[in-house]
């Protein structure tokens, strides 16, 4: 992906700074998920996650130049990006436009008419939850207000998810690939066992599987 933006600036997805920013959002997304929905991380877990995010990035074979060396360095980098670099673009708006949100793959039995009635409320809640995960500076950039009532709602949802997650058996909390990795490491599966693909429940609906927006094994 590359080109020239509306201000005449050239861009390319493989630019090291651009490529690392995408990776940084994966790291922060994992961090926010743990903090908001899983009761948080210990200091040791924070350090481990940061170190693993660097190790993961190194696997891409890209320059390590943009990668902060410490968590403190990363926080400064993140704050700078959110406050001074990010822009409100059509791509950002597309992510937040859930007006055509498809029926979840795990509810194939739900009639389309029923989903059409449920979709507006689901979309509003999903966007509200997403905005709650944003830094305040990003909310401001995109024009979202955030009241005490919004924060209270957000915290209640996070707490409900955290409590529900505790009821899920430990093995079922992991993605099938992560679970298989643990099983290979502990000897439950042979070290050369084939990697599992995305489970059927996670696949897009059949009429959307040819879209380049989705990864579908064997397509």
Model-derived regions, located:
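Mature, function-bearing regions of proteins
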Residues: 1-219
């Amino acid at each position: 992906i590359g080109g020239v933006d509306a201000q005449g600036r050239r861009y390319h997805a493989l630019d090291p700074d651009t490529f690392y920013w995408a990776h940084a959002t994966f790291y922060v997304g994992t961090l926010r998920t743990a903090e908001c929905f899983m009761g948080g991380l210990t200091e040791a877990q924070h350090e481990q996650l940061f170190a693993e995010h660097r190790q993961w990035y190194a696997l891409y074979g890209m320059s390590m130049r943009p990668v902060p060396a410490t968590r403190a360095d990363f926080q400064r980098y993140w704050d700078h990006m959110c406050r001074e670099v990010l822009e409100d673009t059509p791509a950002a708006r597309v992510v937040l436009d859930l007006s055509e949100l498809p029926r979840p793959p795990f509810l194939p039995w739900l009639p389309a008419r029923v989903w059409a009635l449920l979709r507006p409320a689901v979309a509003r809640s999903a966007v509200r939850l997403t905005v709650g995960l944003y830094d305040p500076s990003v909310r401001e950039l995109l024009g979202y207000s955030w009241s005490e009532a919004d924060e209270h709602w957000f915290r209640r949802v996070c707490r409900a998810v955290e409590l529900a997650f505790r009821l899920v058996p430990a093995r079922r909390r992991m993605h099938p690939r992560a679970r298989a990795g643990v099983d290979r490491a502990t000897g439950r599966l042979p070290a050369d066992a084939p990697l599992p693909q995305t489970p059927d429940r996670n696949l897009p609906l059949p009429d959307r599987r040819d879209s380049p927006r989705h990864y579908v094994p064997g397509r």
